[in-house]
Amino acid sequence: MIVSPHKASRIPGNRLRKALMASAALVGLMSAGQLWAFNLDDVAAKAKDLAGQKYEAPKSNLPAVFRDMKFADYQKIRFLQEKAEWAKDKTPFKLSFYHQGMHFDTPVKINEVTATTVEEIKYDPSRFEFGDVPHDPETTKNLGYAGFRVLYPINKADKQDEIMTLLGASYFRVVGKGHVYGLSARGLAIDTALPSGEEFPRFTEFWVEKPKPADKHLVIYALLDSPRSTGAYKLILRPGNDTVVDVQSRVFLRDHVSRLGIAPLTSMYLFGPNQPSKVMNYRPALHDSEGLSIHAGNGEWLWRPLNNPKHLSVSNFSVENPRGFGLMQRHRDFKDYEDLDDNYQKRPSAWIEPKGDWGKGTVDLVEIPTADETNDNIVAFWSPETLPEPGKPFEYDYRMHWTIDESRFQAQELGSVTQTMRSTGDVKQSNLIRQPDGSVAFLVDFAGPALAALPEDAAVRSQISVGDNAEVVENNLRYNPETKGWRLTLRMKIKEANKATEMRAALVRDVPVEAAKPAEEAKHDKTAAKHGKAEKAAKAEQSANAEQPAADAASTNGTPATTEKVLTETWSYQLPADE
């Protein structure tokens, strides 16, 4: 009921004044809370301010005893879990910290954000057990934390496990339920694989929101800094079978860059079936990731098996508005790796899902030679065609999926590449002995529900393209009853071994063109029907149309018109130089 002001009861003056004062106080408190609440804008303001200043390289405060230690000694410095941040609070997430040591010689500032405060989490040496590492307690007084870990009961309700680690430059790693650490992500990559040298931006300060008891996510803010860039990042961590990280970024350039890497991923590939080990090894494969997957804006899916080349290799895949890309580990059986210690079958894939349109650019793949598995030698990122101008902010938001269920990030309506195998090419002689003929052979298995639904005698064929540096001597496609898919065998002779060779393949089949649907019968015009003229005209038109072939109907010789249907993702491979 609306009460007329003229009929409303009058409130005594003192009561009115008290009510107004209480309301004003409440509004003030609410406004203060809303104005104070820490968010990405606060970090972006710091980043913008930094971008207008000359870059100051971080200074190491590390005593020689920690700076010169070996990795085995660094591992002896153990964080005491009972002293984790929020250990005594009923929060689902806890934080533990990395001590400075080796090349982690510069501290990062870590802050706790609550509803009313932002306070630095100060370094405390009593949180660590140093074992037999010789050190003077006085030398640790002015140190800081090198980074931190996020703990969460992801596998067992009564056990806090690491689900995220942030240590070094702008690197971070994430796992889901049942995973072990594998590949890494970074905040930003600059001039990767260029002769001028790569610049590694660094997270210098973090703000972590203290979670409430019922929270299923953790919010982390980060400030990024480097000679030519600054940035503000918001990471929302959501643990689960697949752990998801939502990333918001606002970046400023101090100076021009030649190549910008957005959503960069870093991994390791030593050897596998498409590039067997040169040294005898009981493991069939050794890698954190085995291929780059790309879902282009036009709907195409591409699969690029990784290499450990003898020379630096950079591949660029032109994509407009990518729907997703990632470094993937598709093989998930223990027998694929046979490694009881490192469990490569449990190492996650990372899939980048852009939010919004990213425009024109390339997904870049960098492959670096490595002699062992301790070096990350694979990098993948999105590189925009138009580079931002210094001083002008740019934003890229995306979702990262850390998963061991790669089928969720493949085209359900297409077959996928399940393995790529390389072999010495040979020809079977009349005596049934196989004789090498100087060629190299690739066997590519395509499988999946879409292919399994086809009869084994379906007229499936391969569609291939090979660069000028190779001559194809065999292109053979066979049904594989073991996988209910098809196996493609490509054998080719390489013209110049010191050059890389590109090749692509997909499976297709011809399908009938759908006949054009007959036009809907015209409704009788009432006036024309009344006079009988419209009906007569319609009959004459129908008779004429019956004598004309439909646009896509059978040709004059009775053969149905067909169109080519793509059945699989595109297999794209580069045979490295000097292989």
Curated annotation (Swiss-Prot):
Annotated protein name in UniProt: Glucans biosynthesis protein G
Signal peptide: 1-37
Lineage, uppermost ranks: Bacteria, Pseudomonadati, Pseudomonadota, Gammaproteobacteria, Pseudomonadales
Chain positions covered by the region annotation Disordered: 516-579
Disulfide links within the chain: none
Subcellular location(s) per record: Periplasm
Keyword Signal: yes
Pathway stated in the Swiss-Prot or TrEMBL entry: Glycan metabolism; osmoregulated periplasmic glucan (OPG) biosynthesis
Biased composition annotated in UniProt, kind: Basic and acidic residues: 517-539
InterPro entries hit by this protein: Gal_mutarotase_sf_dom, GH-type_carb-bd, Glucan_biosyn_MdoG/MdoD, Glucan_biosyn_MdoG_C, Ig-like_fold, Ig_E-set, MdoG_OpgG
Keywords noted in UniProt: Periplasm, Signal
GO cellular component, as recorded: outer membrane-bounded periplasmic space
Family: Belongs to the OpgD/OpgG family.
Record GO terms (molecular function): carbohydrate binding; catalytic activity
Natural source organism: Pseudomonas putida (strain W619)
Single biological process term from Gene Ontology: beta-glucan biosynthetic process
Function: Involved in the biosynthesis of osmoregulated periplasmic glucans (OPGs).
